[in-house]
């Protein structure tokens, strides 16, 4: 027997399955719940605390180049397997599965376009592809970006976002440190500006090679920058590390980073800096 009856139907909340996946994200710093549109409007930075989410090269290209117009080059390069490396799965299988899952072909993309009305070359790394690790393809792409910069007599901007060298390629990966560094000297010989933008994280062989070789080394706020990770260092020296150790602000204080730029100011700041470097 029903004793009570609702005069007005209750509000029905959406089932979890009715809410599109990926619509909300949680800020890793302050814990705020952020809507996808809100993140897009703020270039994937938290409007509450300023935390910078990791983003892909194509997103950087879309807001750095004039009118979001850019043209990719050397997209066809693919990784080989010179060592026949196997960990939990063969290296070629790992690359294929990452490509299928991410929709990306490698951990680096190169593009040309206009920046402030002038030609520019941007090479962007992607942590979402095997940790942004540098293997032979990534090294070759950065080297070719330097070549394109020389060809166009245009400034080069490299956006680093990587855990370091790709262990699956062994010495072939480590060779890319010398290769990229040597190729970048051609820009200096011709007076072509090279700006290194370090984002979170810029570690290992990346920080030990081209990421620190810019005419200007700039960074996004609170980016982790270093060679070995803080936990490895702490466990090795058996001592606590200084507060903020290996963060962009710490490196700027000690002279390794020239300036720190919020993502919303990045395009304007790059145009201004390149204007001074002509």
Curated annotation (Swiss-Prot):
Cited Gene3D superfamilies: 2-enoyl-CoA Hydratase, Chain A, domain 1
Any idea which UniProt keywords this protein has? Answer: ATP-binding, Cytoplasm, Fatty acid biosynthesis, Fatty acid metabolism, Lipid biosynthesis, Lipid metabolism, Metal-binding, Nucleotide-binding, Transferase, Zinc, Zinc-finger
GO process annotations (BP)? fatty acid biosynthetic process; malonyl-CoA biosynthetic process
InterPro entries assigned: AcCoA_carboxyl_beta, Acetyl_CoA_COase_Trfase_b_su, ClpP/crotonase-like_dom_sf, COA_CT_N, Znf-ACC
Task: Note the zinc finger regions (C4-type) by start and end residue.
Answer: 27-49
Chief place of localization: cytoplasm
UniProt superkingdom: Bacteria
Entry cofactor note text?
A: Binds 1 zinc ion per subunit.
Reported EC number(s) for this entry are: 2.1.3.15
Top-level enzyme category: transferase
Matching entries from NCBIfam families are given as: accD
Per the record, the similarity remark reads: Belongs to the AccD/PCCB family.
Functional summary from the UniProt entry: Component of the acetyl coenzyme A carboxylase (ACC) complex. Biotin carboxylase (BC) catalyzes the carboxylation of biotin on its carrier protein (BCCP) and then the CO(2) group is transferred by the transcarboxylase to acetyl-CoA to form malonyl-CoA.
Q: How does it assemble?
A: Acetyl-CoA carboxylase is a heterohexamer composed of biotin carboxyl carrier protein (AccB), biotin carboxylase (AccC) and two subunits each of ACCase subunit alpha (AccA) and ACCase subunit beta (AccD).
Classification via HAMAP family: AcetylCoA_CT_beta
Stated name of the protein = Acetyl-coenzyme A carboxylase carboxyl transferase subunit beta
């Amino acid at each position: 027997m029903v004793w009570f009856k609702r005069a007005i139907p209750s509000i029905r909340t959406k089932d979890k399955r009715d809410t599109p996946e990926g619509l909300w994200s949680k800020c890793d710093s302050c814990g705020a719940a952020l809507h996808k549109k809100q993140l897009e409007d703020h270039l994937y930075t938290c409007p509450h605390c300023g935390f910078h989410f990791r983003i892909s090269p194509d997103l950087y290209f879309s807001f750095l180049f004039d009118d979001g117009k850019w043209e990719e080059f050397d997209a066809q390069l693919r990784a080989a397997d010179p060592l026949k490396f196997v960990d939990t799965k063969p290296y070629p299988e790992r690359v294929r599965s990452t490509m299928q899952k991410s929709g990306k072909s490698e951990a680096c993309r190169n593009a040309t376009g206009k920046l402030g009305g002038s030609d520019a070359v941007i090479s962007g790394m992607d942590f979402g592809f095997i940790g942004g690790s540098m293997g032979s393809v990534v090294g070759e792409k950065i080297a070719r970006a330097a070549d394109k910069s020389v060809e166009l007599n245009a400034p080069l901007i490299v956006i680093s976002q990587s855990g370091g060298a790709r262990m699956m390629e062994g010495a072939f990966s480590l060779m890319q440190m010398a290769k990229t560094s040597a190729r970048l000297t051609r820009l200096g010989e011709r007076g072509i500006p090279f700006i290194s933008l370090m984002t979170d994280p810029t570690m290992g062989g990346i920080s030990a090679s081209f990421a620190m070789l810019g005419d200007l080394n700039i960074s996004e706020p609170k980016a982790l920058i270093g060679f070995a990770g803080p936990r490895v260092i702490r466990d090795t020296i058996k001592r606590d590390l200084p507060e903020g150790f290996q963060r962009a602000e710490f490196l700027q204080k000690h002279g390794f980073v020239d300036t720190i730029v919020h993502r919303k100011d990045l395009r304007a700041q790059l145009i201004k800096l390149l204007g001074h470097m002509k």
